From Swiss-Prot:
This is Cytochrome b. Its main location: mitochondrion. Keywords: Electron transport, Heme, Iron, Membrane, Metal-binding, Mitochondrion, Mitochondrion inner membrane, Respiratory chain, Transmembrane, Transmembrane helix, Transport, Ubiquinone. The chain crosses the membrane at residues 33-53, 77-98, 113-133, 178-198, 226-246, 288-308, 320-340, 347-367. GO terms for cellular component: mitochondrial inner membrane; respiratory chain complex III. The keyword DNA damage does not apply. CDD domains: cytochrome_b_C, Cytochrome_b_N. Belongs to the cytochrome b family. Binds 2 heme b groups non-covalently. GO terms for biological process: mitochondrial electron transport, ubiquinol to cytochrome c. Heme b b566 binds at H97, H196.
Amino acid sequence: MNNIRKTHPLMKIVNSSFIDLPTPSNISSWWNFGSLLGICLIAQILTGLFLAMHYTSDTMTAFSSVTHICRDVNYGWLIRYLHANGASMFFICLFLHVGRGLYYGSYMFLETWNIGVLLLFAVMATAFMGYVLPWGQMSFWGATVITNLLSAIPYIGTNLVEWIWGGFSVDKATLTRFFAFHFILPFIVAALAGVHLLFLHETGSNNPSGLNSDTDKIPFHPYYTIKDILGALIMITTLSSLVLFSPDMLGDPDNYIPANPLNTPPHIKPEWYFLFAYAILRSIPNKLGGVLALVLSIAILTIIPLLHTAKQRSMMFRPMSQCLFWILVADLFTLTWIGGQPVEHPFVIIGQLASVIYFMLILLIMPITSMIENQLLKW
């Protein structure tokens, strides 16, 4: 009798994706983050679903409904904090996943990489709209400031902003549509993640050496299933510790004040995972220029395959490129720190320098260094 795992139409797909999938024998723990992102997405959809059962997307009751969830719903506080901090875990895994792709040259799988960038944009949009829903001070003013950036678009800007707002300011219509989009986008993200995997399985996984691994493959199960379970346990332990011991560590205290259009908070800032992009936005004095830099700070990932001048795919055997990669990581930490600081000296100039270094490293310094390394190979 034929094995149902290999003959059943649905089981066949699962089998070829998670069981019999030929996988390079030398992939390290940096390859765990794809599965961790899948777990994060499922956790966010489930906790979000239970929150949506009790949440009301009305300006008069949104803040109260979140309070009601935390105080009156059975384990509502747990669901709410798992969802809020789960978003932070999601972005930690995302940044590490993208960093892994940059370091080991995974961007050479063009379709997989570009869908990944699209996924990053979609997750960022989802997270931004989710932050607006509790309708605290930072929710309201964050929504006002970020949506207002679209008014920098020539000619159609003002009309576009009012169309998104559904009025002349961030109000009930805005909150309702943000809730609708925040609910639907994770399912679109899940579908895109499926396409992301589809394209990845066309080529097979990359590996730390960057070399073709067709001669040395092992089945995904049990070797990498057990490895992914270990990664998942570490992530779940970290998330649980965060949720149960300091659930508000990554949030903003201002969001415990109900939204008030008549009172602006002293420092408007987004969640920590957007601070690097926010710092780049603020470092340019011109509004349109800032918006372009903000979009380009993420969109630049799409042109990285074009900037790959090295003869080797991975940075594993390229020490100069490795140094530059870690300088880029340090620069992103600097930008994240600056994004959370007030707009005053010396933070402004540090932010501007860090922004210039960010774009210079990716567009100029790293490609030139790769070319120098190519010459060094001949020695």
